[in-house]
């Protein structure tokens, strides 16, 4: 069982508004950053069944699901929808560039993200038209 005390972290909370047709409710805590070499480590926690904003990672990204479940909704090269489910303990690494949204499972989610970007660009938020 994961035993890291997240209550001592400084969390920044994000919510959607009436102009979103999906429930946005997540928080980010910076664990560490080394801007001179383009490294950022984050914890992100989601409320049950909540989403983050639609976005694209520009940096190489390491993902480790610590608690709960991550539903990843990607857009394939041909515009097709791809749904992946990652459970606690699942690890992934991607080079960046994929359009996607993430949604927590019914018990929420706590996920570690490590970004590596030589130019300092990590991700960009997008609208439905990209």
Where are these regions (language model features)?
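Double-stranded beta-helix
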Residues: 80, 101-130
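Active-site region of the double-stranded beta-helix
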Residues: 30-37, 48-60
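Short histidine-centered beta-strand/loop micro-motifs
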Residues: 42-44, 52-57, 74, 83-84, ...
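Glycine- and acidic-residue-biased ligand/ion/polar-headgroup-sensing regions
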Residues: 57-77
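Histidine-centered metal-chelating micro-motifs
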Residues: 50-53, 71, 90-102, 119
